[in-house]
Amino acid sequence: MRHRKSGRHLSRTSAHRKAMFQNMAVSLFEHELIKTTLPKAKELRRVAEPLITLAKEDSVANRRLAFDRTRSKAAVGKLFNDLGKRYANRPGGYLRILKCGFRAGDNAPMAYVELVDRPVGGEVVEAAE
């Protein structure tokens, strides 16, 4: 029985899930808007929002924790230099999930995941399929 077990499996092993959400978080921080399936978008929120909260206080220890979770120097740099300052006065709720219809091939529900208060403009990046 799976009583009180949180999170979605998404038909993947735990290592595959961890790598996928790590990559999706890095893409989100880099582009600030990505398109993915709705269940992945909802799970991505559980990965990305704590990283932004971590970036609100800039310290070597926090940078190392963020690097451990993203494995991307560029993402850590943007988190602490840009996003942490942008959301310094916001107590959570850094992501917005917008439903955007269904994928043509398998009719999967799709969604945009974007950072709130982002500068408007730019292209949409397709996330992990």
UniProtKB/Swiss-Prot annotation:
Keyword annotations of the record: Ribonucleoprotein, Ribosomal protein
GO BP annotations listed: translation
InterPro entries tied to this protein: Ribosomal_bL17, Ribosomal_bL17_CS, Ribosomal_bL17_sf
GO-annotated molecular function: structural constituent of ribosome
Presence of keyword Ribosomal protein: yes
Single GO cellular component term: cytosolic large ribosomal subunit
Family that this chain belongs to: Belongs to the bacterial ribosomal protein bL17 family.
Subunit description: Part of the 50S ribosomal subunit. Contacts protein L32.
The name this protein goes by in its record: Large ribosomal subunit protein bL17
Naturally occurring in which organism (per UniProt): Pseudomonas aeruginosa (strain ATCC 15692 / DSM 22644 / CIP 104116 / JCM 14847 / LMG 12228 / 1C / PRS 101 / PAO1)
